[in-house]
């Protein structure tokens, strides 16, 4: 099986799938809180020297993939999105394809068994390519998954991205993909006014170039009914998961203040990475 490698130690994923199918997963060992969770006095570290092992949580459409992908590029670690793994399996016409299609189109969560199997295969492939560290996006989604993950490796930090539900619905309904190049875009223009002490949120659409305009397609599961069902299911399952990581001192909750131009610099600051990006830009 694949191994999740960290500096000065490694955590074997041997038996990762078998652990899941056992009646229960052993409780993971409590780890020291990530230095990124401390206040302004937190020491800055060189993330590339740490082979970071991070998890991104958040409702569907919040932008986990966008920010996890950017951090992946900045830190030089793989971004592993379980949603992408599911879509790749759907497109493969493999044995799980039809079953997954029914689950996704109904807005249901894919079972733990399937997700663990797909993730195990991805980690094995990554190890073969010499990858170390990771940023997980979309896993874990359940307490069972979190316990399994905690049993085989130490997570440094869990970033929980947040947006108001009405913004999430609009973002999901605005998602588009170019059927030719495969790039993702968003046609939603969001301008939520602030009220009751809550700041307003403005997000410009992420429009495609001219050559992609006529080739845009919508995901089958991005209908209002399905999106709201997914949000409801996520909210029901996320609270125990958030509390699990909160008690371990690993949860960082981050309210997105707007689109990428507003949110990215503030996220880097919260992660103590703002000066790191500047150094990377100078070195480039």
Swiss-Prot record:
Organelle transit peptide: 1-36
InterPro entries, A to Z: Adenyl_kin_sub, Adenylat/UMP-CMP_kin, Adenylat_kinase_CS, P-loop_NTPase
GO MF, one example: adenylate kinase activity
Tissue: Highly expressed in flowers and at lower levels in roots, leaves and stems.
Residues that, per the record, bind ATP: 61-66, 175, 258
Effect of deleting the gene: Enhanced root growth and increased amino acid biosynthetis in the light period.
Subcellular location(s) of the protein: Plastid, Chloroplast stroma
NCBIfam families in the record: adk
Protein family per UniProt: Belongs to the adenylate kinase family.
Assembly with partners or alone: Monomer.
The protein's name: Adenylate kinase 1, chloroplastic
